[in-house]
């Protein structure tokens, strides 16, 4: 039997998909702008 692939880890989640990571690059800021435009309640992890 192989193990489950999703092993939740809040710190890794934030480091990979977090708000500060999104703000770092132009593409990431574009993602946030799109999500704001769509009216998402949660912008990032």
From Swiss-Prot:
GO terms for molecular function: structural constituent of ribosome. The keyword Ribonucleoprotein applies. One of its GO terms (cellular component) is ribonucleoprotein complex. Keywords: Ribonucleoprotein, Ribosomal protein. Transmembrane segments: none annotated. Disulfide bonds: none annotated. GO terms for biological process: translation. Belongs to the bacterial ribosomal protein bL34 family. This is Large ribosomal subunit protein bL34.
């Amino acid at each position: 039997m192989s193990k489950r692939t999703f092993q939740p880890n809040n710190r890794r989640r934030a480091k990979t998909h977090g708000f500060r990571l999104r703000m770092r690059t132009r593409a990431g800021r574009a993602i946030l702008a799109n999500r704001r435009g769509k009216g998402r309640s949660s912008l990032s992890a």
